A protein has these predicted regions:
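Substrate-binding/gating loop at the entrance of the active-site cleft, primarily
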Residues: 119-137, 145
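A glycine-/small-polar-enriched, mobile loop at the entrance of the PLP active site in fold-type I
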Residues: 38-95, 99
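Conserved active-site segment immediately N-terminal to the catalytic lysine
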Residues: 212-224
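Active-site C-terminal subdomain of aminotransferase-like
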Residues: 48-49, 224-314, 318
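Active-site phosphate-binding strand-loop segment of PLP-dependent enzymes
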Residues: 150-205, 218, 226
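Conserved beta-loop-alpha segment that forms the PLP phosphate-binding cup at the N-terminus of a helix
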Residues: 89-117, 125-128
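Conserved PLP-binding catalytic core of the aspartate aminotransferase-like
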Residues: 322-356
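PLP-dependent enzyme catalytic core of the Aspartate aminotransferase-like
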Residues: 19, 32, 367, 371-398
Length: 398
C-alpha cells in the first residue's frame, strides 16, 4: 500500500473515522536532512556568517510585537546609527535583501516627473536607473567607464545641466570594485537643492562612511556582506530632508510593502503598530552582526579590511595579476576585481577554486563578463588566513 492509503486505513480518532481527501502524491518528495558543503565565500556576497550570528539566528522565535522583540528592534536601530555614523531617527532594517532597501529609497522619494540624476559607474548604477524609471522618474545619467569613478567636476557639471530633485550614487560599485569619493558632493547637492542618495551595500562596515558628515539624505545597505549575516534584513536611513520630501508627496507611495509612511508606525519607537510580520530570526542575526561591529570599533574594522585588501593586492601582483581599478585609493577594501589574464578561462578557474578548494569567487558580469574575477574580503571573511589560502590556490591553478 502507498503511504496515503495506509494513513487512510489507520486514521481514526476516538473510534470515529477521520475525514480524508484525495491527495495528489506526485510531488511528495522524500528528502534527507539538509547538509550543505562547507564553502569559503570570497565572492561579492554573501559572505560567511560569523559563528555568533549563526548562533543568534537559531534563537527561539517570538512575536513581532512582543516586548522582548521591541528591544531587539531598538538595539538594531541604535547600532545601525553607530555603524553609519548618523543620528537619523528614521534608521531601520527593511524586511528583504539589499535590492529591497534600494527599491524602498526610490519608491518613497521618487514621484512621477522628478528628475533623478544617477551616477553610473557599473551595473548597480544601471539598476538605479531602471528602478527610478519604473517609478516615473525623468532619469538622467552622469557616467564613467566601468572601473573608474566620477570626479567632483563631473558631478558639478551634471547638476548644473540637469537640475535634479535627487542625485543617486553608488558608493561601492560591486560590479567593478570602484569606491566613489564623496567629499564635496553634498555641498553641490545643497547648492542645487537636491537630495543625495547613496548605495552602501558593499561599503557598510568595511570602509569609512559618515552619513551625517557627508550630508547624505538617504542611504541603504544589506546584511550579507560587511555585516556577515544571512540576507534578509537590510539597513535603510532617511534624514529630515528626505522625510520632508516624503511628506510632500502628492499621492501614496506606489509600493505598499515598502511604504515608509506606514512602516514608520512599526519602527517609530512609540506606536509599534502592525504593518507586516518582520523576519524575526533575520533580525536576531542582524543584531548580533552589529554587536560585532560595535565590539571591534569602526576604526579598527575599517583598518582590518584595508590591511587585508592591501595584502591581497600585493599577493596578486606577485602572481602577475592586476586589479581592474587602477588607483588604489578608489578600490573597495572589501571587494577586489582582478583582471583575467589573456588566454585564461575565467569560469574554469572559478570552477576549480570551488570544486577543488571549496573557495567561491565570482566572475564579472555586464561589460566585465569573462574579464575579471570579483574577490570579496567582507566582514568575518576579511582575515589574513583567507588571503593566504586564496593566493596559494590561485598559484597552483594558474
Amino acid at each position: 500500500l502507498k503511504i496515503g492509503q495506509i494513513w487512510t486505513k489507520q486514521a481514526k480518532i476516538k473510534g470515529r473515522a477521520m475525514k480524508t481527501y484525495p491527495v495528489n502524491e506526485a510531488h511528495r518528495l522524500e528528502t534527507g536532512q539538509l547538509n550543505m558543503p562547507p564553502r569559503l565565500l570570497l565572492g561579492p556576497g554573501p559572505s560567511n556568517a560569523h559563528p555568533r550570528v549563526l548562533q543568534a539566528i537559531s534563537n527561539q522565535q517570538i512575536g513581532h510585537l512582543d516586548p522582548a522583540f521591541i528591544g531587539v528592534m531598538n538595539d538594531i536601530q541604535e547600532m545601525l546609527r553607530y555603524t553609519w555614523q548618523t543620528s537619523n531617527p528614521f534608521t531601520l532594517p527593511v524586511s528583504g535583501t539589499g535590492s529591497a532597501a534600494m527599491e524602498a529609497t526610490l519608491a518613497n522619494l521618487v514621484e512621477p516627473g522628478d528628475v533623478v540624476l544617477v551616477g553610473v559607474i557599473g551595473y548597480f548604477g544601471e539598476r538605479l536607473v531602471d528602478m527610478a524609471g519604473r517609478y516615473g522618474a525623468d532619469v538622467r545619467r552622469v557616467e564613467r567607464p566601468w572601473g573608474e569613478v566620477l570626479s567632483l567636476d563631473d558631478i558639478s557639471q551634471a547638476l548644473d545641466e540637469h537640475k535634479p530633485a535627487i542625485l543617486a550614487l553608488v558608493h561601492a560599485e560591486t560590479s567593478t570594485g570602484a569606491l566613489q569619493p564623496m567629499d564635496g558632493v553634498a555641498e553641490l547637492c545643497r547648492a542645487h537643492n537636491c537630495l543625495l542618495l547613496i548605495d552602501t551595500v558593499t561599503s557598510l562596515a568595511t570602509a569609512p562612511i559618515f552619513l551625517d558628515e557627508w550630508g547624505v539624505d538617504a542611504a541603504y545597505s544589506c546584511s550579507q556582506k560587511g555585516l556577515s549575516c544571512p540576507p534578509g534584513a537590510s539597513p535603510f536611513s532617511f534624514n529630515e530632508r528626505a522625510l520632508a520630501k516624503l511628506d510632500r508627496r502628492q499621492g501614496k507611495v506606489p509600493n505598499w510593502y515598502l511604504d515608509m509612511t506606514t512602516l514608520a508606525n512599526y519602527w517609530d519607537g512609540k506606536t509599534r503598530s502592525y504593518h507586516h510580520t518582520a523576519p524575526i530570526n533575520s533580525m536576531y542575526a542582524l543584531r548580533e552582526g552589529l554587536r560585532l561591529v560595535v565590539e571591534e570599533g569602526l576604526n579598527e574594522r575599517w583598518a582590518r579590511h584595508q590591511a587585508n585588501a592591501e595584502l591581497l593586492w600585493d599577493g596578486l601582483a606577485a602572481l602577475g595579476l592586476s586589479c581592474h581599478v587602477k588607483e588604489p585609493a578608489n578600490r573597495i577594501p572589501a571587494l577586489t576585481t582582478v583582471r583575467v589574464p589573456d588566454g585564461v578561462d575565467a569560469k574554469a578557474v572559478a570552477g576549480r577554486l570551488l570544486n577543488e578548494y571549496n573557495i567561491e569567487v565570482a566572475g564579472g558580469f555586464g561589460q566585465l563578463a569573462g574579464k575579471v574575477w570579483r574577490v570579496g574580503l567582507m566582514g568575518f571573511n576579511s582575515r589574513k588566513e583567507n588571503v593566504t589560502l586564496l593566493l596559494a590556490a590561485l598559484k597552483e591553478i594558474l
